[in-house]
Amino acid sequence: MQTPATSLLIRNAHVLTLDDDDREWECADIAIEEGRIVAIGPDAGARHGKPFERTLDATGLLAMPGLVNAHFHSPGNLMKGSLPGYPLEVFMLYEVPPLADGGDSSRLAYVRTMVGALEMLRRGITSVHDDAYHVPVATRESIDAIMRAYADAGIRATVAIDQPNIVEYDKYPYLAALLSDDERFAMDKAPRQTTEELLALYAYLIERWHGADNGRLSAAVSCSAPQRVTPDYFAGLSELSKRHDLPFNIHILETKVQRVLGNEKFGKSLVRYVHDLGLLDERMMVIHAIWLDDDDIGLLADAGCTVAHNPVCNLRLGSGVMPYYKLRAAGVPICLGTDEMNTDDTVNLWFVAKTASLLQTLATRNYREWPEPQEMLAALTRGGARAMRRAHDLGRLAPGCVADIALLDLDTVAFTPLNDLRRQLVLCEDGGSVRYTIVDGRIVYENGRINGVDEAALRRELRELAGGYREQLSRAAAEARRLEPHYRSMYLRAAAEDVGMNRWLA
């Protein structure tokens, strides 16, 4: 784990707080003590009245809240650029093969998680909300590997166990009828964990890691998606979320196939299904939320849910365009995520914000409604903080908040000339201007290096481990190719259904 933070003074920074008053100073100090901001302003250092362990001269640098990657799957970190463009249902067939039998080693899980965390820190991303899946089953060892990686990297991480527990063909419409008896039998026999086994793993995650390292590491819960779990497991997760005030990750209506599934299996939308179970609440971060109707949006707003928008992933998989304006009008808070490295192929949250902003210009001709830079900056920071149940002390620079800060060089091409700081942060910055990343008051990245980590050695090890991983994927891909015609038929049939809306541009 990283060494404990003591005290740090950031001097002479251009400060963008993104607080309730959106305060900005062209030259100010930020005083940090025991991982939290204690004073901010032109004379914050003098007002503190104590010596600092370190003073950082930030002349020419912008200090802003660290970015929050609100939706991520670390197990995809080895798969950047590995798969062609497929719709989600076909994509997942290759990504998480339903008949997979071999698991990843704990060392592989550690290294791939670590590499992703370091890439985020280099871009000024100080927090990640990791919906970590485990193939074929979750174990204490795989949970520990992921959490230790985040502990050692120095990033703030909230982590869930994303583990479906129903048979593969029941997750989709029409698929059971398309498969042969032998194929269904093989899926029936595939490893699958019980409600009791999964809740026991959650108990371990919470007891061992929730609140660790001064609260930098924490637990969330995840059902993956409502159609992928049994009702008793779903209810058990909801109870855990309420008892410990944990975020609840839930993918809902990411694709048209899922809209059709809700109608076919439950006779209602998946949002209405969750609501009718009595499980829709303010702890839920609803991921993707593309194929929503007006009733769904009203239910999300009434429940106080947050929506995680992943526009690059949505484009990569052809899932559709999220109804941003309707969600905004209903008052649904929005945060931004990269999703995983095989559906975004990077962890560049700056590019996600730019894509989210520009994509919505195609959704309305009323240009006065187009997203303003301030909306995207809020989604990059405070929106993700809310989804992580940290709205009170994360995502803004203010006394009492955790000291999660990105320092960007204003003498770069992104800000030359400096015409509009907020607009250029959203439209010009790509993470290349980040010079320092501070998490919990600790400088974890400075001037091109992650403190305390031999990145070159880590990358070498990752390349060595990736060879065996690619062989494993190659074997799985052969089975996936055999099943793909069934998934394609299912996808095309669902795509042709009239669901009363269209979220595609075509």
What are these regions (language model features)?
Residues M1-A28, E33-V38, L380-A506:
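Active-site microenvironment of metallo-dependent hydrolases
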Residues A13, I30, G35, G60, ...:
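Divalent metal-coordination and catalytic microenvironments
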Residues D276-R283, Y325-T412, C428:
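His/Asp/Glu-enriched, well-ordered alpha-helical/loop segment
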Residues L78-A109, I166-R192, K256-R283, T306, ...:
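Active-site gating loops and adjacent loop-to-helix segments of metal-dependent hydrolytic enzymes
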Residues E141-A289:
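Metal-coordinating catalytic core of metallo-dependent amide/deamination hydrolases
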Residues K80-D131, P136-R156, L198-N214, R463, ...:
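Alpha-helical scaffold segments that flank or form the walls of functional sites
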Residues S238-P247, L279-E282, L299-A308, A329-I334:
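Glycine-enriched alpha-helix->loop->beta-strand junction motifs that scaffold or abut catalytic
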